[in-house]
A protein has these predicted regions:
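S-adenosyl-L-methionine
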Residues: 1-35, 67-108
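Conserved SAM-binding motif I beta-strand of class I
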Residues: 59-66
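Conserved SAM-binding loop of SAM-dependent methyltransferases across substrates and taxa
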Residues: 44-58
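A short SAM/SAH-binding and catalytic strip from SAM-dependent methyltransferases
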Residues: 102-120, 138
Length: 191
């Protein structure tokens, strides 16, 4: 069990705000209208809450996927508003590495949790040409609370790992505190 307020920590919110800003810019630039969002490894799906609060009519629907049933229970509470209002948010208990995304049309795939996943099989199932947004960290701690399984040492390494056919955005943001800090890397582009 994890503290339910953990998804509100400074570094996680800062990273998600950065993602919102850059993803919205990419969607405008690519002239994508009313996309469905698929947030893989969504945890409490605070990202859906943030995206829909910023641009409530921008998206068709949002799907959040997480392997942890407790996280999905929290996600359903965080996104309760969109059970009754549009766009709808659907949260699913699902191992994203064992799901077929090939039928997802006009969809954008977001994964901010690749560092905590055993593999990147999810990426193989995303249809070619779809917009993908991937965010990770240079943290290396496999213990609580980070549970890092896949390390990334640089933005270049992330770009090479996923080899997008059209890289629209790549960047780094620093999360710095008095005694420690880390980097977040993000890429947005067409698979």
């Amino acid at each position: 069990m994890y503290p339910p307020h953990e998804s509100f920590y400074h570094g996680l919110i800062k990273s998600k705000l950065w993602l919102c800003e850059e993803l919205e810019t990419a969607i405008y630039r690519e002239c994508i209208s009313k996309p469905s969002l698929h947030i893989l490894g969504c945890w409490d799906n605070l990202l859906a809450f943030m995206l829909l609060t910023r641009k409530p009519t921008f998206y068709y629907e949002v799907h959040g996927y997480d392997i942890n049933p407790e996280a999905i229970t929290n996600a359903n509470k965080v996104c309760d508003m969109w059970k009754y209002e549009s766009p709808k948010v659907y949260n699913h208990v699902q191992d994203v590495n064992n799901y077929d995304y090939s039928t997802c049309i006009n969809s954008i795939f977001i994964n901010c949790s690749i560092d905590q996943m055993d593999s990147n099989n999810w990426y193989n199932s995303v249809p070619k040409g779809r917009l993908v947004c991937i965010q990770t960290t240079n943290m290396k701690d496999p213990a609580f609370p980070w549970y890092i399984k896949q390390t990334t040492d640089s933005l270049d390494e992330l770009v090479e790992r996923f080899n997008l056919s059209n890289l629209i955005y790549s960047g780094v943001t620093n999360i710095q505190y008095e005694t420690n800090g880390y980097k977040r890397y993000m890429i947005i582009g067409r698979k």
